[in-house]
Every structure is written in C-alpha cells, then in structure tokens.
C-alpha cells in the first residue's frame, strides 16, 4: 500500500511540478501594467505589431495548438462574435507557437478571418507568462489578455473554458469600456 501511495505522489509531482520547472515563462502581466510589445508574423505572412493597435481594444488570446478540439472551439466562438468585437472597437489576435503555415491551414479549414500569430520561438508567450516548455515540446497556455487603447493590460484570464470564453470576454469589454 505504501508503494502505491509513493507512486501516486511521484506521478502527481511530475505532472504538476516538472512543467513549471521547464516553463521559461515570466509572471503574467498584472492589470494596469504595460502590455509587452511584440512583432509576430500572421497567417498571411505579414508582421503584426501590438503598438499598431494603440487606440483600440485588443483581445490577445494564447492557445496551445492549431486544429485541436478545444482550440478550434475557442477560435470558432471568437469568429462567430467578430461583429460584436467590431462594435466594441476591439480586435482579436490569437497566438500559439505553431508556424505561419499551420495557422494558414487552420484559418482556411475553419473559416477564421481574424489574425493568428506565429510565436515559434515562444518569446512572446513567455513575456505574457503563457509558455509551457517541456524541453522536447513547448506550447502556449490557454490565457487571454484584454489590452486597453493606451496599451495597458486591463484584464487577464488564466483559467479559460474554450466553450464560453468569447462571451465572457465580451461582457468584460462592456464593463471595462463603461469605466
């Protein structure tokens, strides 16, 4: 019985602690702090710079992998709600460590018309505290940041349900824009 308990403890430690040891991420930017600036290629191959969106609200969402069930559901919901984001003067930008080619295929297959950004080296994901690096594999954690028109982080989400997340973000935008 003691052997089983010891094995369970070791497995739990490996599952929860090892990814943190290899994370490579910094802390998640706090609300009211400047959003880390970046320049990343989109699925179209053009550079997207955060500073170019000053004056608009930005929904910057990080996700693990193109064409996986949760990430596809989350992207679909952001796509369905694009008109609502436009009404709020907000732009949606998705970020993962996938390649430009992977993003291009994902957008074509799923009918996505907002920008997906390729953070292949993981630097931007790390700057936002959203990189998990396991050594042989790395991926972005499912985090979202609402960035206000002045370039400051207005709200962070570090626990995201891909199914209803877009609705939550829209409600938060409504609240934030009333302040």
Question: Model-derived features: where do they sit?
Answer:
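Structural microenvironment flanking redox-active thiols in thiol-disulfide oxidoreductases
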Residues: 72-112, 120-126
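A short beta-strand-turn-helix
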Residues: 29, 38-58
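Thiol-/selenol-based redox modules, centered on thioredoxin-like
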Residues: 139-179
